[in-house]
């Protein structure tokens, strides 16, 4: 069974040529990308504490390569997959134009070579757009090496997330196109926790991403009511920051 949601794919296929237009439909992602990358690199460095160029990263649902490109430029060995061929074409063209080496593949997580494991699996702003979420997440964590890690981000299913993530972001401020998000697809951290119960993977850290209107900037926060990052790792490995993770299980 595939985790693809054809309606979601159709939405992104229409704008797949525009990933690198900072003033286009993906403008918000460009604005939050620096803080996203800062968090990702910080967590990978803390987890491995060794030279980054030797690490293999899988970027699932890579889109136009907004995360894959700068990670590869940092020295990571990046494989990036996306279900949309048009996304892969846009990403590959941009990487070639900028002389950045990335292994781009048009593939779903289910179609990916099953025995290929990675030091880090990344899935940023994707799971709120897939069909069978539990299947998707279980397939995702299967590709983590022993003692490896995963970093995912998504949107919490709260009234605050509906107000800010849909009403304000889509209909008032126009930060993203209308109908980009479906509130019913938002996920509480506790739901992901339950999905991982029968695996050897657990949540190691939760961290929120919030907008500060006074400073007109995005920043990391312990507020996970809307956007949040989640670090995953082996249940036998030391937690990165277990207190926020445990606190988040009530959300």
From Swiss-Prot:
In the record, what terms sit under GO molecular function?
2-polyprenyl-6-hydroxyphenol methylase activity; 3-demethylubiquinol 3-O-methyltransferase activity; polyprenyldihydroxybenzoate methyltransferase activity
Q: What superkingdom heads the lineage?
A: Bacteria
GO BP annotations, alphabetical order: methylation
Catalytic activities: a 3-demethylubiquinol + S-adenosyl-L-methionine = a ubiquinol + S-adenosyl-L-homocysteine + H(+); a 3-(all-trans-polyprenyl)benzene-1,2-diol + S-adenosyl-L-methionine = a 2-methoxy-6-(all-trans-polyprenyl)phenol + S-adenosyl-L-homocysteine + H(+)
Q: Matching InterPro entries, A to Z?
A: SAM-dependent_MTases_sf (IPR029063), UbiG_MeTrfase (IPR010233)
Q: Where does S-adenosyl-L-methionine bind?
A: 36, 61, 82, 124
EC number annotated for this UniProt entry? 2.1.1.222, 2.1.1.64
**Pathway involvement of the protein, from the record:** Cofactor biosynthesis; ubiquinone biosynthesis
**Record key words, sorted:** Methyltransferase, S-adenosyl-L-methionine, Transferase, Ubiquinone biosynthesis
Please verify whether the record's keywords include S-adenosyl-L-methionine: yes
What family, per the record? Belongs to the methyltransferase superfamily. UbiG/COQ3 family.
Annotated function: O-methyltransferase that catalyzes the 2 O-methylation steps in the ubiquinone biosynthetic pathway.
Q: What is this protein called?
A: Ubiquinone biosynthesis O-methyltransferase
* Taxonomic source organism: Rickettsia akari (strain Hartford)
Report the gene name: ubiG
């Amino acid at each position: 069974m595939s985790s693809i949601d054809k309606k979601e794919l159709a939405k992104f296929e229409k704008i797949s040529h525009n990933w690198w237009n900072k003033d286009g439909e993906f403008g918000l992602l460009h604005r939050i990308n620096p803080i996203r990358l800062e968090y990702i690199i910080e967590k990978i460095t803390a987890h491995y504490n060794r030279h980054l160029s030797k690490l293999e990263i899988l970027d699932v649902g890579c889109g136009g390569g907004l995360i894959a490109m700068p990670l590869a430029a940092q020295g990571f060995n990046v494989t990036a997959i996306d279900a949309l061929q048009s996304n892969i074409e846009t990403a590959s063209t941009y990487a070639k134009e900028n002389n950045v080496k990335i292994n781009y593949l048009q593939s779903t997580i289910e179609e990916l070579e099953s025995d290929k494991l990675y030091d880090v699996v990344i899935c940023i702003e994707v799971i709120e757009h897939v069909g069978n979420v539990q299947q998707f997440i279980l397939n995702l964590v299967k590709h983590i090496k022993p003692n490896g890690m995963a970093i995912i981000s998504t949107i919490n299913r709260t009234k605050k997330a509906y107000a800010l993530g849909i009403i304000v972001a889509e209909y008032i401020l126009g930060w993203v196109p209308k109908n980009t998000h479906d509130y019913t697809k938002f996920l509480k951290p506790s739901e992901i926790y339950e999905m991982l119960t029968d695996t050897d993977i657990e949540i190691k850290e939760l961290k929120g991403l919030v907008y500060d209107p006074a400073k007109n900037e995005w920043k990391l926060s312990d507020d996970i009511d809307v956007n949040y990052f989640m670090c995953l790792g082996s249940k036998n490995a030391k937690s990165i920051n277990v207190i926020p993770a445990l606190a988040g299980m009530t959300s």
